[in-house]
């Protein structure tokens, strides 16, 4: 043919010059797709094909050959699928990122909404084009190509006509949306390869990445539909949690109510000042909301910057008995404090108590009643007077932790002077009138306790005590049922002043059986 690779015959029946060097030295197996020699010998095939077979062949574009893509299956242009809602096609490709699929209706209009095609690796230099069909009917399945070393526009590669006998269920099916820089940033899908249908509202997305320039990923969940904003309906909740894995990252998702959700995942970069980059996205159909309490802890940027690690829990907390605890691993001597809220109301600071041992700080929490609460955790570096916000969790309590919930209030001097609680790590609920409290302390510290009524009026004088082996046990007789306060005072003999210093207090509830 004299015009081979030089141009094409247009609709105006005129020859249009358009040189294409890829048409020269082409493998006859691919040349036969678009040109049928009248003489079989010029097919240069081991097994020549008939005119009828030629007319069934799909016609790859010149760009397909230029970028080195080859058909390994489905070499005809029309396929009928009776018993399935999907189709898989195999191709040879030197790179995964140079291919993209697309699904159109019979008129050639690209389908909107969910992504119905996916290109996935399937062995060395082999890829699979997978397509799902939203409904029975006729569709055009397309494969697009581009250069490997640039992000130029996608160009037509191949087009198939598919007669689908089945379609996926409503609000089902489809594949993840892949960002423009997905492969350039070194990401690969691990699982799932399709959009998610969740029976319990939970989803787990795993993606591979070994790029040292990526510092992490984050997920953002949105409920599909107008005027449906999770931030408004679930203020204070975080519905995505990311964990580092050996291969990359796992994003855990909680859907709070049944419905259709859109999950978008973004990459964080080590390069300072660079904004987060879109990685991929999924549709999640939740058939139920996560119960009894959805969501995950919210961590501030400072939490990571200080080198802290949230050990447990890594989900919001459900506590049938009203008692919760949070463990944080810290490389430094950070002083943690917890503050409980219900709605917009700040609750008594005495409902939280913090202990530290072997580099792990534990924040204990008492719910004062049934309901949902928000725990805000703050941290203060040694030598600093300012506490900084670090984290928040939601706690759902089925009951109050106690009839007298909360913990003793301890001033900084209590710990700085070396005092420790031996018993009664919580506020005291006593069914008897006699109460004892034991404190350990250095030999240069002496302690005394005083009893006050619910109106903060002192009852009597200092309470009797016994000291042995650097421990002091104080005895107290409660005069009647009701609420009281035990105030702790101490004297530090190593200081010039020997005056008593207020160190802390217990709330006491005397309730006879």
Language model: regions and residue ranges:
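Short, flexible loop/turn segments at beta-strand junctions in immunoglobulin-like
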Residues: 131-133, 253-255, 364-368, 475-478
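Short beta-strand elements
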Residues: 148-182, 269-305, 381-416, 492-513
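Aromatic sugar-binding surface patches on proteins
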Residues: 114, 118-129, 233-251, 350, ...
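Solvent-exposed, conformationally flexible loop/turn segments
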Residues: 81-86, 124, 198-202, 246, ...
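Short, aromatic- and glycine-rich surface loops/edge beta-strands on solvent-exposed regions
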Residues: 135-149, 256-271, 338-339, 369-383, ...
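His-Asp-centered catalytic microenvironments across diverse enzyme cores
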Residues: 3-112, 176-197, 301-318, 416-429
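Extended low-complexity, serine/threonine- and proline-enriched intrinsically disordered segments
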Residues: 84-119, 206-240, 327-352, 438-463
């Amino acid at each position: 043919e004299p015009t081979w690779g030089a141009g094409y015959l247009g609709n105006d029946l005129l020859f249009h010059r358009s040189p294409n060097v890829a048409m020269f030295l082409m493998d006859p197996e691919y040349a036969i797709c678009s040109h049928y020699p009248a003489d079989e010998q010029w097919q240069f095939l081991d097994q020549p094909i008939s005119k009828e077979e030629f007319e069934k062949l799909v016609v790859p574009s010149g760009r397909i050959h230029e970028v080195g893509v080859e058909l390994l299956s489905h070499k005809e242009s029309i396929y009928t699928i009776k018993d399935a809602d999907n189709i898989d096609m195999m191709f040879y490709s030197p790179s995964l990122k140079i291919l993209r699929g697309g699904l159109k209706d019979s008129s050639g209009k690209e389908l909107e909404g969910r992504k119905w095609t996916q290109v996935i690796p399937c062995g060395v230099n082999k890829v699979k084009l997978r397509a799902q069909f939203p409904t029975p009917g006729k569709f055009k399945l397309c494969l697009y190509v581009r250069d490997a070393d640039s992000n130029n526009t996608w160009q037509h590669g191949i087009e198939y006509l598919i007669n689908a006998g089945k379609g996926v269920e409503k609000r089902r099916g489809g594949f993840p949306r892949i960002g423009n820089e997905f492969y350039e940033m070194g990401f690969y899908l691990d699982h799932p390869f399709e959009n998610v249908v969740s029976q319990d509202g939970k989803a787990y997305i795993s993606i591979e990445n070994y790029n040292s320039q990526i510092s992490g990923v984050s997920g953002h969940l949105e409920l599909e539909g107008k005027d449906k904003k999770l931030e408004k309906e679930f203020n204070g909740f975080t519905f995505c949690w990311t964990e580092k894995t050996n291969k990359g990252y796992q994003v855990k998702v909680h859907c709070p109510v049944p419905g259709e959700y859109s999950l978008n995942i973004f990459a964080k970069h080590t390069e300072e000042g660079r904004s987060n980059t879109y990685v991929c996205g999924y549709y999640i159909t939740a058939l139920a909301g996560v119960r009894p309490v959805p969501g995950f802890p919210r961590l501030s940027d400072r939490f990571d910057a200080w080198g802290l690690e949230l050990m447990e829990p890594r989900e919001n907390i459900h506590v049938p008995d009203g008692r919760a605890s949070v463990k944080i691993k810290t490389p430094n001597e950070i002083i943690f404090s917890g503050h409980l809220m219900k709605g917009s109301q700040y609750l008594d600071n005495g409902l939280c108590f913090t202990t530290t041992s072997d580099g792990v700080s534990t924040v204990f929490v008492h719910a004062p009643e049934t309901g949902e609460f928000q725990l805000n955790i703050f941290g203060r570096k040694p030598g600093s007077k300012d506490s900084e916000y670090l984290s928040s969790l939601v706690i759902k309590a089925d009951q109050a932790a106690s009839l007298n919930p909360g913990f003793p209030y301890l001033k900084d001097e209590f710990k700085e002077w070396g005092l420790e609680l031996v018993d009664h790590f919580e506020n005291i609920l006593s069914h008897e009138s006699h109460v004892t409290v034991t404190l350990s302390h250095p030999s240069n510290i002496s302690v005394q306790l005083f009893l006050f009524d619910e109106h903060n009026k002192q009852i009597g004088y200092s309470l009797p005590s016994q000291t042995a082996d650097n421990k002091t046990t104080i005895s107290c007789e409660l005069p009647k049922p009701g609420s009281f306060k035990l105030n702790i005072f101490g004297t530090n003999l190593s200081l010039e002043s020997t005056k008593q210093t207020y160190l802390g207090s217990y709330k006491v509830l005397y309730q006879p059986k």
